[in-house]
Amino acid sequence: MIRTLAAAAFTVLLAGAAPAAPLDGQQTYDLLFRNGTLDAISRDAALVYRRDVTNTIKPETGDRDTGAIALTFREGQDATLAKLEFRKDGKYRVLGSFPASVGNPMIMYFYEAVVRDMAESAGGSPFYIRNRVKEALIQPSEVEPGTAMVDGRSVETRTIRMHPFADDPNRDRMQGFGDLELRVTVSEEVPGWYLSLVAEADGGAVYRSELAFDRLDPSQ
């Protein structure tokens, strides 16, 4: 079982000697939506993530949306499916099922949750917000090499930062979400690829959503 350390479930230490490497749009997408990231995971196992949310515009949503997200497997009609469940206080809510062969759907859940949260908090069209976020996922970026402590050992990581509304003409009307940063940290040594997926508005002062790898349970 692997558990990340520190209060936020993981600690990323950027390696100062290694500069950020530029990626074109396709390379950014391929790193974020990497294929085959579930292939080595036993179909009897469960990947468990922790979602922590703070929202100063709608404080009540923080408690509502904070909890565990579990990824388990089930056999579909034509293929194995990865099922996502929100778990809190002994209650389970299915979030969706996705073909396991494609990769880890946690990133899709992450950005859809951010789109929903932003639309609910700041107003505006969720379709407009989603389109800006999706565009950010295929833009050129820089990947930051680093390390993280996982289960008491140091592992190599890569982090991509995205700012969907940096040049948006409406950003000043977004109640702090105009400064939204999406930050995805991945590692070959973390089951399921994603170590953390973080969204921060106004540096976290307005809104923060962190989805962090917690553990691999050998059985569901």
Task: Map each language-model feature to its residues.
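Surface-exposed, glycine/proline- and aromatic-rich loop segments on solvent-exposed faces
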Residues: 92-117
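Bacterial N-terminal signal peptides
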Residues: 7-15
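Bacterial N-terminal signal peptides that target proteins for export
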Residues: 1-6
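Acidic, serine/threonine-rich low-complexity disordered tracts
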Residues: 21-100, 121-220
